Amino acid sequence: MIMDELLNGITVTKPENHDPLLPITGIQFNSRKIVPGDLFVAIDGFSADGHRFIDQAIANGAIAVVGQQPIAGLEVPYYQTSDSRKALARMASNFYGHPCKKHIMIGVTGTNGKTTTAYLLKHIIEQSGRTCSMIGTVNNIINNQVIKSKNTTPDPLEIQSLLAESLDEVVIMEVSSHGIEQQRIEGIYFDYAIFTNLGNDHLDYHESIEAYFNVKSRLFKRMKKHGTSIIASHNEWGRKLQYKLADSAQEVFTFGNRTDDEMQLINVCTEYFPVIKVRHGKSTQKIQVPLPGMHNVWNTLGALLTVEKMGISIKEAARHLSTFKGVPGRFETFSHPEGATFIVDYAHTEDAIEYCYQTAKRENAERIVHILGFRGKRDSAKRKDIVSLCSDVCSQLILTLDDLNGVPKDRMVDELKKLNNEFADGSAEIIPDRTKAIQHAWDKAKDGDWVFITGKGQETYKQSFKLPTSTDKQTIQFLKTAKHPVSS
């Protein structure tokens, strides 16, 4: 692609040595990935400033550079822009030929429920005869090929590459607040956008819950001409978003328990795998929700309303739900020889953990046991509220480690001790090794116990633990098949 085509729609200051016909063979924002013929985009990142690596990029073969800082005297053309992140995303879209235009694009955002809603959508859409790609937290799935995810919302180059590679009719994207704030979805427009809910999360990144909401709501400004918004009204932030979009040209539909919702939940007939009664238009029908818990009632309703707007009847979609097999790392249940139930779940917010407890209570759990870990360099402000919640509900709370992310282990253990003393009245057990914490709960489990292991879901461990496993699920499977007690 020639330079002027790549810069189309991007405001830059063009240098004297600008060549509109300069052929660009690739784009990179990592100087180490540059090959001759590439353009380098210098981004002021969170851990390093890309402008420091311009010389390295040129040495590796970059033939042009885009950045924010005023820089002179380079041997290649340098284009200054006000926002190099936005420029990167727009150039990526230009480079790959605006691939979002060839797909029906569905964006899913919210604190909780993005992944489950995306998997539900993919299943229903594919069972209805359409092909579907997915970009999200667990995996990226393109043309039926599974690619392990690095982030919920990938960087702009990866997103546009995946969209260009996809031959599927529909693409579902989980859209994180980080992805929106960091301009990763710039240049992408959606046919459908879904808002699941909002809760206290990522407040180490966003200055307040209001700022977090405002970032999330920016997804709904990225709609195609006849775009449709699907909003959960049972959450106060969903109602605020509905009000915010009232004067927009797009169609806005809600699901919840209000009489004015497009899809209204009338009642829940059973609890664990809920059978629900739903009103849509003038008709009502019973629907079997394929996943446990009230939170999955809302996830299912959001998926059903979206596919209905795509032309798939609620009756047909509900029929397809019967063959849904679940989501990796989302409320995956495992039986214990003594009759206990172990659950691996990604839950890492108060709301998500409360949903887990509600399900256990509805199933008459005799005891709730929780193995809870926190990650280094993550939102520490929410930890005290989560520990307080867990200690109030659980018969046994075990505090353990999640990913350290460069924080010294001793410092994280001290943090667990402090949380235990201040917000759990010293009642929690502290077992830093995550696998040994799970083994401890496994060895002590009794009939009627519900044991939750939260925070990582399907994710692999980033450091080594005592047991020879790499995920929470593998740890449980190891303990189920171990013929002899595992040494401490």
Language model region names:
Residues 63, 191, 395:
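Receiver (REC) domain switch/active-site residues of two-component response regulators
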Residues 134, 173, 193, 231, ...:
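Structural beta-sheet core signal
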Residues 71-75, 192-342, 417-424:
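Acidic, Mg2+-coordinating active-site environments of NTP-dependent enzymes
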Residues 9-10, 88-233, 237-250, 301-304, ...:
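Phosphate-binding loop of NTP-binding sites
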Residues 1-90, 236, 264-267, 286, ...:
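N-terminal leader/targeting and accessory segments in enzymes
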Residues 67-70, 175, 197, 233, ...:
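Short secondary-structure boundary segments
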Residues 1-12, 36-39, 305-315, 319-326, ...:
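ATP-dependent carboxylate-amine ligase
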